[in-house]
Amino acid sequence: MLSPFATLHFGLDENNTAPFIDNNEFDLVIIIDSEEYIRACRSLTTNPKIIIEVHTSIERNLEYLGRLKASDTDYFITVSEYMIGRINHHNSDSVKNHQIHLFENVLDSTLFELEQQNFPGPPVVLWIGKIDDHKDWKAFMEISSNISTASPDTEFWIVGGQTCPEELAQQVFETAEELGIINQFRWFDRVENNNMSQVYSLVSCRGGVNLVTSHGESFGMAVLESLLANCPVVSSDVGALSEITETASYFQLYELGDIEKSTQMCLGLLNSTEAHASTMKDLNSIRASLINRYCSSIRSSGYWDLLISLGGV
């Protein structure tokens, strides 16, 4: 897929990474949240510029930053102002003065458009992510139960969680049963990225909402995808999510853990045809600005220019 611009190499580990880099005499090495490769690069005999890209928002996965040596990296790149703060918080004293460069995530905006199809059915509250405490599937279930009481026809969909252990998967269904939403609950454990636009479009056309209950996000790609496909979002106000765009009817933020507030926000979008129509109009009005800010065809050259400037190539 990447040819002729890139070659993929599999099986690189801490033992063979340094010889591979030395043999190919790379000008620039980019390491994304991988302490194993950082350690490997300590034995390089060549002298490429090394950039560490920081994308994870999970605090325990950021702890490697506190073990960095001054020679481990020349620069940092990350995706949000929030993550700049987390890097500064975790970085060891040895790299406290290293420059941190901001380059927001980009996507192919042509993959995320409202698909004008007939999607008959009840409203859907969509939830996307891994089945874990960080994404907080339990909060989604609790909010869904509250919504169901006021809007009994609404369906509740999870997309993701393919790697969920069987025991945890059983717990998900048992929770749906206990909360009285099992008949409205749907779980699609894997949807290919190029099909997600259709999911967002279905939710939008049925007057639904994308609900986010996450405890932390370094950027919020699923939120951006949803907005580009004209699907409104109700989200916990965590991490970098507030940086994506200004809040409005189509992008509402609630304090993490506020089940009642998030329930009311969702119901406000689900129960009013007039409010839904107004929200769709507002979403259409910001699409061009989102594309200009995040579209890969517009922004990717800026990332390349940044690498060239940092690598001194």
Language model: regions and residue ranges:
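A charged, aromatic-enriched C-terminal amphipathic alpha-helix characteristic of glycosyltransferases
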Residues: N271-I308
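Short His-centered aromatic/hydrophobic patch
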Residues: I31-E36, V54
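Nucleotide-activated donor-binding/catalytic signature segment of Leloir-type glycosyltransferases, i.e.
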Residues: A169-S197, L202
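Aromatic "clamp/platform" in nucleotide-sugar-dependent glycosyltransferases that forms part
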Residues: H215
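Conserved donor-binding/catalytic core segment of Leloir-type glycosyltransferases
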Residues: I77, L111, Q116-K135, M141-S148, ...
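A short, active-site helix/loop in glycosyltransferases that binds the activated sugar's phosphate group
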Residues: N61-R67, S71-Q99, L107-S109
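Short hydrophobic beta-strand element within catalytic cores of glycosyltransferases
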Residues: V209-L211, P232-S235
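Conserved acidic donor-binding segment of nucleotide-sugar-dependent glycosyltransferases
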Residues: T247, F251-E260, L267-A277
